[in-house]
């Protein structure tokens, strides 16, 4: 799946495709969320192809689904179930920890489901900018709550405030996908994570899906539209040499 195919299916607009390309190339940490069948892995695969070809990338998956093309230094790791004796299991947590010793420039985790979320966030916070992952959630705000729960599974006893601060400093952008009533898969919202303030992680919606007058019960018509909110955290964009505004 390529970005061109996402454009053809109406999941994103050309403007959004260009913004995503800028964000990936500037090494923003991006989380993609949605329900079952919303196209998270497909979307992750598509935007992963924006990663510059000369970077060292490590992918971590339960089963190899990602097909990132053109990366010369790509290492693909897969989890392994325990054998009949209950030994030999290799978890996502194991692989994320191992990958950090392999000097990656980016880490792409197919999906976080449990305690490995803590290791993923720590990797994002310790110099592995540009990392990408997906998770099950019904909205961008719900993704934050689910991340909190998953981190608690990996670090029992860590204060909730510390967890929220960790999430806010690690994740730059959250993208929410959905499978709509006509079975089409659409990008519903793109939010910037602003930081942690007054006990809450602050989100800044940049794009939101808006249905138009042509929508019916059987067919959804609409597109992602700019909210009018300015994109605040442009530090990585400027650091990458990009002077365009988002």
PLM regions and their residue ranges:
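Hydrophobic anchor at the beta1->P-loop junction of P-loop NTPases
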Residues: 32
